[in-house]
Amino acid sequence: MRGTVKIGERDVDMLANAASPFIYKKIFHKDFLMTVGTNYVDADGKQKTDVDTNAITEMAFVMHMQTVKTFKEILDTVTVEDFVAWISEFEPLDFAMAMAEIMGLYYQQQKTTVSPKKKAAQTERPYTTALFVLRSLEAGISISDLDFFDMGDIYDILAEHSNDRETYARTATQEDMDKF
């Protein structure tokens, strides 16, 4: 994901992609998200106040590499001298202060921009845990089965169970499924 991060007084165009952890591991022999994630952002996603300065320098180096457009350019053009010239344009704590925003680019990839196509069906009563267990038992799912399925599986089973009540003009055969 490409984004602009404000570091000090300057906006820096940064590319946060799958190459970042690979490059980081190749150079520093450490896990990128473990090092950076545990050093800069706490469990609530807030900026930590105590930050390892080595991790800041390493992250700044990765950021510098990610300002270059392609992975080939990174391998061909990024040198220590180039990095020192680039990082000297910033104040000492600029990177530490921007780490939450920088890490936000990486964590933003987990978010979705998709919105649901259908509105949730209005029911007469709220969907409680007891109602969920009742519907699961009606569909033939035992309490011990709930340990093996995730919520998506259960909802799929419940949807298929409710579809069983419908009558269809034609039911697919094994031959139809094989052709599909």
Where are the model-predicted features located?
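Juxtamembrane transmembrane-helix boundary signature
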Residues: 60, 67-68
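Elongated alpha-helical scaffolds
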Residues: 54-62
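Charged interaction scaffolds used for protein-protein
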Residues: 1-11, 18-26, 30-50, 54, ...
